[in-house]
């Protein structure tokens, strides 16, 4: 778990995470969220399917698909003194309807602490919708792969940089290179463009 695939865009990261999860041994567990509208919204009450289809920034997906052994990342600060901060990486050890048991990714080969995570209530932004709503879900997302930006501040033994297209922001490549502790732990996956050039 002291390794990751880094990519410049969320779209690439989501596809990579899904591909790695499918290859991981074990049975997938689907964990749906509980979504609800806060207060009355009159006659324009959204249907549950609409809420389930939404994935605003800062809110977990409606359906979280995990396996034991999956690498996940916290999406919210839960308890900073215990290392449970937004961006912390963990390995799923057991999956329950209301509790995930995970182990923090250790540093320098040392095993991390085992923690239990509960579902939390997340609130929609008042500016994005004509009504307020909440989603109760585990505050994690898959993290076999992550965006280069999200990897800032982390140090890993092995990093694969996946570049299906050029980086779009100045300094992104430097950030990706500097995540690995030693140059021998760095790998690249470059995809040729339509003309066959890298």
Which positions does each model-derived feature cover?
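RecA-like helicase/translocase P-loop NTPase motor core
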Residues: 1-198
